[in-house]
Amino acid sequence: MERAMEQLNRLTRSLRRARTVELPEDNETAVYTLMPMVMADQHRSVSELLSNSKFDVNYAFGRVKRSLLHIAANCGSVECLVLLLKKGANPNYQDISGCTPLHLAARNGQKKCMSKLLEYSADVNICNNEGLTAIHWLAVNGRTELLHDLVQHVTDVDVEDAMGQTALHVACQNGHKTTVQCLLDSGADINRPNVSGATPLYFACSHGQRDTAQILLLRGAKYLPDKNGVTPLDLCVQGGYGQTCEVLIQYHPRLFQTIVQMTQNEDLRENMLRQVLQHLSQQSESQYLKILTGLAEVATTNGHKLLSLSSNYDAQMKSLLRIVRIFCHVFRIGPSSPSNGIDMGYNGNKTPRSQVFKPLELLWHSLDEWLVLIATELMKNKEDSTDITSILLKQKGQDQEAPSLSAFEPPGPGSYESLPPGPGDSKPEVLAGEQEASADCQDVISVTANRLSAVIQAFYMCCSCQMPPGMTSPRFIEFVCKHDEVLKCFVNRNPKIIFDHFHFLLECPELMSRFMHIIKAQPFKDRCEWFYEHLHSGQPDSDMVHRPVSENDILLVHRDSIFRSSCEIVSKANCAKLKQGIAVRFHGEEGMGQGVVREWFDILSNEIVNPDYALFTQSADGTTFQPNSNSYVNPDHLNYFRFAGQILGLALNHRQLVNIYFTRSFYKHILGIPVNYQDVASIDPEYAKNLQWILDNDISDLGLELTFSVETDVFGAMEEVPLKPGGGSILVTQNNKAEYVQLVTELRMTRAIQPQINAFLQGFHMFIPPSLIQLFDEYELELLLSGMPEIDVNDWIKNTEYTSGYEREDPVIQWFWEVVEDITQEERVLLLQFVTGSSRVPHGGFANIMGGSGLQNFTIAAVPYTPNLLPTSSTCINMLKLPEYPSKEILKDRLLVALHCGSYGYTMA
């Protein structure tokens, strides 16, 4: 009966308290009953359960083998912690990682728990498996108020963890100022190294902790490297911690020059160096000038090393350009930079800031001497039998004949002894062995071109940073004009110099024209790489489309009105952000990513030429489009043309192909290339033939009575439009007929659609600078925008006709098709463009190629062979005029020259 009553009482108490009133007999089950109560600090319930139980309060459970005392200390359950201690819980019991309850209380800042644990003799000197003590945990988290209490119980404040780090190390690393001061006041060793030799100052600098570094230095911390020779300054510069560098320099002024010299270290990230020097330069005017002067001196030294042929070209070139970039960056951020209009000295005024360039004048003088020397040797009389290379060989004491300079043949005797010396009387050197500049096999142009071009690039950068944005330095323009012939020799010998060092051409239209013919002769692939390198040069991520886009910058468009909604949202969007990254989402759809972006561009490229918008009309070939001169029927036509330009510019910027092809004349308008009468064939083939006829025949006695005016339909009424002022009274003659043809071409192809062209270019140039796009011709621009089409050679052969003596079985024809099969896909496209004016094969294959008067098969006509004669074409009738070459090798060579070097001998036969 008593037992039943006892069970009933237990049941009643359990129901009233909504918990068990007795612990299970086994510890494993009991501990999980107690744990939530301990975490909630329900000490009365815990006490009641423990009072009638044999539970072991030191029982370790779980994966990490902790006791309930660990749980109480970790959660700050101070009442339960005291209860457990009174019940005999071991305050120094370590879990599987070696942590005691005191460690956990210290890590989480449980002050009351720490105090009670210390009362019950918790050992503050116990280390966990990593060697960390409670004092380390307090230092890591900056628990200074607890540290004051704990250090009184610590026997060694410099106790080390497994890596030899003390509490002072970790406090300095985490920037806890008051903790650092407390540890130092408690006797911590300020210069104690860890196992790798790193001191507390080293740790503070590794994370840019300026304030803790200043406390250490103020208290006499030594500036010491680690065992690998890495110094605190190295760490500051690596992390870009300008403020911490400033503190180090305050206590160790000699480090200022060290930072300047660090610009030569290619292992240091350039942006971090810029960050540090930018901060230091903004502290005072004198320090700003001191930094710039130091950088100029280092650049000059590196430049002269680069001009020495015994140096490593690649390393010295990178070092010089890196230093000059940093120099220009620091110079621009000063209060008298070009951007804020304060005089920088480019008008001839010598200001303190412009004087920082003075050390560089030595380098520019040496550069000028080199170029003058080379120009002098190139101009010497051909009777002289000794070229520059021979002179270099004589300096080496060699008597063998030097190789000739085949590209220039610049003979001329003499010796460098008779030439004006450069700075420091240094003279060009040539070393034997495996030196880059071995005169045994290379002439002086080959040896020096890259080196001098790199210095020219540095010179341009320094000239530019002294000018307001958008202006080219008159001094640099004068320099290029002075040395024009030598620079062209460099480029002719090694065209890659343009892409490596002559970046100034893209920013100086007045200089670009001097080299454009050389640039356009370079491989299309190389120019594409140069184009995108400079297009994205000022942007944070070169992989533009894949750059993350914030939710606010997503283009949310409606699929059922994609053209109008896209036009509206793109017109309002931030152009800079669109250049950096683009993301599209269709309204009501969840999909995003590159697939959606590609779909968006693809749909828009079709919508742009949708007849409903009246923006473009289909040309005579049935596959290309031309701006519609009557687009004004759409009131928003100019806004839409601007949007079309934005879409094509965006697509090119993000390397997205568009499914749209324009007439050759429109590509010319985009590139700023003048149209010619052959372009008229795209919109009016018969009229183009008439213009060709005028040019090909003597019109003196034909009585055409043409004047420099034409009749045109203006809003339904015929009006006479003069081609030039007073054109209605100027007769077209044999002497001025070429001018007439050009002016009437411009009227049909340009003036009639000038507002549309201007609106389109306004949008296009928001994303693609005119200076960059001019790297390409109209054929290449089509490939950039619309990609490389696939060409079926068998279909091409099947649908080709032969005339003027050629037949399918002729050897020349067989050689031709063998060459077509051998060349690259890109070269096949160039051939197709060369003959038909288009890079595309229409739907249905070569059987559907259009000519000026309808369907016109690809045709090959025989031309009598003369040495060096190139193939020509008549695009209006898709005819290739192929000379009767004597061999396949000559045929291939001449054909590729015509394709790559622009032998576009178009006629309207």
From Swiss-Prot:
Organism in which the protein naturally occurs: Mus musculus
Entry's Gene Ontology molecular function annotations: small GTPase binding; ubiquitin-protein transferase activity
Disruption phenotype: Mice develop spontaneous, late-onset cancer. Moreover, tumor incidence in mice heterozygous for a p53/Tp53 mutation in higher in a Hace1-deficient background.
Residue numbers annotated as active site: 876
Occurrences of domain HECT (ranges): 574-909
ANK repeats (start-end): 23-55, 64-93, 97-126, 130-159, 163-192, 196-226, 228-253
One Pfam family cited in the UniProt record for this chain: HECT
CDD domains found in the cross-reference section: HECTc
Annotated keywords: ANK repeat, Cell cycle, Cytoplasm, Endoplasmic reticulum, Golgi apparatus, Membrane, Repeat, Transcription, Transcription regulation, Transferase, Ubl conjugation, Ubl conjugation pathway
Subunit description: Homodimer. The homodimer is autoinhibited and stabilized by its N-terminal helix. Interacts with RAB1 (RAB1A, RAB1B or RAB1C), RAB4 (RAB4A or RAB4B) and RAB11 (RAB11A or RAB11B); in a GTP-dependent manner. Interacts with the 26S proteasomal complex through the 20S core proteasomal subunit. Interacts with RARB.
Activity regulation comment: Sterically autoinhibited in its dimeric state.
Protein name from the UniProt record: E3 ubiquitin-protein ligase HACE1
UniProt xrefs under InterPro entries: Ankyrin_rpt (IPR002110), Ankyrin_rpt-contain_sf (IPR036770), E3_ubiq-protein_ligase (IPR050409), HECT_dom (IPR000569), Hect_E3_ubiquitin_ligase (IPR035983)
Region (N-terminal helix important for homodimerization) residue spans: 1-21
